[in-house]
Every structure is written in C-alpha cells, then in structure tokens.
C-alpha cells in the first residue's frame, strides 16, 4: 500500500469514527427546527453554519462513544469492523480527535452562529451521551435507550437556540415548540432502536448490553414499540396550531402509516407469524424524514398557522 492509499484509509477510518449515517439523521432534525423557529424568514446562511457546527459536535460525541464502547464492539458482529476494533486508529488519537471537534464545535456555534447557548447545549449533549448514556445507562438498564435517547433530541434545541439568539429583540422565542420537537424524537427513539435491537438481540446479549429485546419477550417489546409509536404520533399533533394545514395533513397521514406498521409487527409476533423487525426500523427512519420534510416545507412557505386562523394569540402561534 503506497502513501496515498494509506492516507485515504486513515481518512476513511476517522470519518467512520464519527458515524456519518447517524449524524445525517441528527442534522435532518436541525433543519425543520430552525425553519420553524424563524417561520418564513429562511436564513439559509445561518442554517448552514449551524449544521456544520452541529455536525462537529455530533461527530465528537460519536467518536467519544466509540472509544468508550470499544470493549463492547469487539464482541458484536455488527460492530467488529469499526476502526478502533481493527486498530485503524488508536484510542488516544481518537480521543484527541474528539476533543478537538468538541472545542471547535463550541467556538463555532458561539462565535460564527452568535449563540453561546447553542454551544453550551452541544457541550451538555456530549457530556450526557458519554458519561450518562454510554458509560452507565447502556450497560446497566433495559431503559437505556429511553433516557439515553435524550441526547439524540438535542439538535432541535441547538438549532432553536441559534435562531432565537439571532432574532430581533422582543421577538417571542416560542420555546414550547422546540420542546414538542424534542419530545417527538424522544418518543420516536425507542421503537426505532428496539426494532433494530430485535434483529441483533444475540449480539447485544453476547456483549452484555441489556437492551429491551434481550431481557423481555418479543411480545412485550413490540407492545412497548406500539405505545411509544402512539406517543410519537400524538406529540406531533401538538404542533398543529403552530403550522399550516400542510403540516397537519403530513403529521396525520405519516403518523397513521407508522402506527399501522408498529401494530402489524406486534400482531405478527403475538400470533406467532414470521416477522421482520428491520422493516420497522427502516420505516421509522422514513417516517421521521417525511414528517420533518413536511414541517420544513410548511415553515418555508410561511402560510398562516392554524392557530392564527382560529384567532389564537400570535405570542404562541
């Protein structure tokens, strides 16, 4: 292998440390939050700057996670090809990389995006993801992904903070909408993750990670998936007064679609049929993407909100 090939392999290893596919999903959540926060204004430059700062923060968290989980990754077939397991990058170099991304992400959001609050949210997210979720919850409780999933909800809060810190003085921040979007992802994370964990249950058991499918029956797991799916869909409805009919239609149609598939998985398990949990995992990704794209379109168009049409106070809607 020549020097160029070695350099490319090293770059690929560092990129893999950041879990780029996971980051894509996180960034998908940031865009609609920012568009909704500045409804109709569409400050594309600020959004792009925030996405880059958020990408660095998420990349730092994922890299720290790989360092902390390297012992587990060695035991799981799904993760044995990761860079640290294969010694493509040393733990020390990965840690330096993660710390560098952390500092740059914080300064980026503070200075270039003019939001120290967003920078602090990034630091809080990284701390929570590593020290609360990765080092404790993931290894100690079957509710690991329920509470640990809060870290994955933070991109909407980061994006909202950037917009509100750049709004004209006196403009209502409407943080309740950010909280709703936070809770949408919070409730969505368990069914999304448990569907994948059902597929790789033996892997998690071998690594000693008490994911719900490892410690509960498939019927109980899918029952919980249905309940969290219901909570996800109902939470999206809370935002209906703050958006137009476009969001309302997409929230209802995509929500029913997601719920029907979750119920179908549960009934298939309960009736002893052949089921494919990975289908729900993929569909859950598609559901969230469809919902957030719909919300983004609604916010970009900036049409009158349903709450405004009903004459409710503009302070909230």
UniProtKB/Swiss-Prot annotation:
Family per record: Belongs to the UbiA prenyltransferase family. Protoheme IX farnesyltransferase subfamily.
Task performed by this protein: Converts heme B (protoheme IX) to heme O by substitution of the vinyl group on carbon 2 of heme B porphyrin ring with a hydroxyethyl farnesyl side group.
Annotated metabolic or biological route of this protein: Porphyrin-containing compound metabolism; heme O biosynthesis; heme O from protoheme: step 1/1
Keywords, comma-separated and alphabetical: Cell membrane, Heme biosynthesis, Membrane, Transferase, Transmembrane, Transmembrane helix
HAMAP family linked: CyoE_CtaB
Name this protein carries in UniProt: Protoheme IX farnesyltransferase
Organism expressing this protein natively: Corynebacterium diphtheriae (strain ATCC 700971 / NCTC 13129 / Biotype gravis)
Gene Ontology CC, one term: plasma membrane
Topology class, membrane: Multi-pass membrane protein
């Amino acid at each position: 292998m020549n020097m160029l090939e070695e350099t490319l392999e090293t770059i690929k290893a560092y990129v893999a440390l950041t879990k780029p596919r996971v980051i894509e999903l996180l960034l998908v959540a940031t865009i609609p939050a920012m568009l909704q926060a500045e409804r109709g204004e569409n400050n594309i430059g600020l959004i792009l700057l925030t996405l880059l700062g958020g990408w660095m923060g998420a990349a730092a968290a994922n890299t720290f996670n790989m360092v902390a989980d390297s012992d587990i990754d060695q035991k799981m077939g799904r993760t044995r090809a990761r860079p640290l397991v294969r010694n493509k990058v040393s733990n020390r170099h990965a840690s330096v990389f993660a710390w560098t991304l952390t500092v740059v992400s914080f300064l980026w959001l503070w200075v270039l995006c003019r939001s120290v609050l967003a920078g602090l949210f990034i630091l809080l997210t990284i701390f929570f993801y590593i020290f609360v979720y990765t080092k404790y919850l993931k290894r100690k409780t079957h509710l690991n992904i329920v509470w640990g999933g809060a870290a994955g909800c933070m991109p909407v809060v980061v994006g909202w903070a950037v917009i509100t810190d750049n709004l004209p003085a006196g403009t209502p921040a409407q943080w309740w909408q950010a909280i709703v979007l936070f809770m949408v992802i919070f409730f969505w994370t368990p069914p999304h993750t448990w569907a994948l964990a059902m597929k790789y249950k033996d892997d998690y058991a071998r690594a000693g990670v008490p994911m719900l499918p490892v410690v509960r029956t498939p019927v109980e797991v899918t029952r919980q998936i249905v309940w969290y799916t219901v909570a996800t869909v109902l939470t999206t409805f809370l935002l209906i007064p703050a958006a137009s009919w476009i969001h309302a239609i997409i929230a209802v149609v995509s929500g029913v679609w997601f719920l029907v598939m979750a119920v179908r998985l549960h009934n298939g398990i309960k009736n002893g049929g052949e089921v494919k949990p990975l289908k729900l995992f993929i569909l859950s990704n598609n559901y969230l993407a469809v919902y957030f794209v719909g919300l983004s379109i609604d916010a970009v168009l900036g049409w009158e909100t349903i709450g405004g049409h009903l004459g409710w106070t503009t302070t909230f809607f």
